[in-house]
Amino acid sequence: MRKRVLIVDDHQPFRAVARELLESAGYVVTSEAADAAEALAAVAADSPDAVLLDVQLPDRDGFAVATALAAADGPAVVLISSREADDYGRRVAACGARGFIPKSKLSAATFGALLE
């Protein structure tokens, strides 16, 4: 079964690139969200298997969203950011996310490996 993914990022051009990348690898992008409120609503409405979640959102940081999803036994979360992983280290593990990928290194293979 193909994994269903929600993409959360406040930059629409990045969401378009991520959608193309994931769909070309066989993922089904259920929806996109530009902020935390939209993301939480989309998770409730669409029940995705995974969320590709930006750390820096306009209304709430991605760590808080990932923590809320983990507490609710929600979908797997992979965090992304334009900053490098060493900036976030322990926070990624503490929020219940499966891992972190810098946006410059995003690939369907890396995303999939973190979901396994």
Predicted segments, located by residue:
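Acidic catalytic/metal-coordinating carboxylates
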Residues: 35, 61-64
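Active-site residues of response regulator receiver
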Residues: 9, 54, 81
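Short amphipathic alpha-helix used as the core "switch/output" element in two-component signaling
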Residues: 63-74
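The feature encodes the CheY-like receiver
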Residues: 58
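Two-component/phosphorelay signaling modules centered on CheY-like receiver
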Residues: 12-31
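A short, hydrophobic beta-strand element within the central beta-sheet of small alpha/beta folds
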Residues: 74-86
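Alpha4 helix (beta4-alpha4-beta5 surface) of REC/receiver domains from two-component response regulators
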Residues: 64, 83-101, 105-113
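Acidic, metal-coordinating helix/loop segments flanking the phosphotransfer/catalytic sites
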Residues: 32-50
